[in-house]
């Protein structure tokens, strides 16, 4: 719950206040439990990475956007959708934790709306994504101007180039064995929906299957 609320607040700072993610994320990570810091990073980076696609999905489900003081709840919905589309967090947990975060953000009156939007997406995800993905820049997560330039320069390979550009290099992290065993750390990451495996390069080495950032 707190992790989703912090993710929405970080995204608001980046999009509405023009702050850099690298500048605001560390302070937010200090406000959540150590075991949730990697998840917070994944939610922030991932939501911003796929912002146009997530925004398009919201626009398919809502007639009127959330504005002004309610804008933070738009970002919370984006965080919820990111979990449903791009992570292996169980859908029921992703929805419940995101909806519960509404209370922390002091928007209890919007709880029903946010719950409805996320559950609507659960029911109709295939149709919604099929509709918005007709626009290549949305489907492939690139700005429209860059998509046009790539299509003009690489007539037959532009989609392959954009798909390759979305791939992230492997990310390795080091477990602090003085605090917990590597197996315990892997178990905590699995509970948070972060897929990782033990690395062969060292006793404390962990490889993230879905890098953050």
Where are each of the predicted segments found?
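Class I Rossmann-like S-adenosyl-L-methionine
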Residues: 1-213
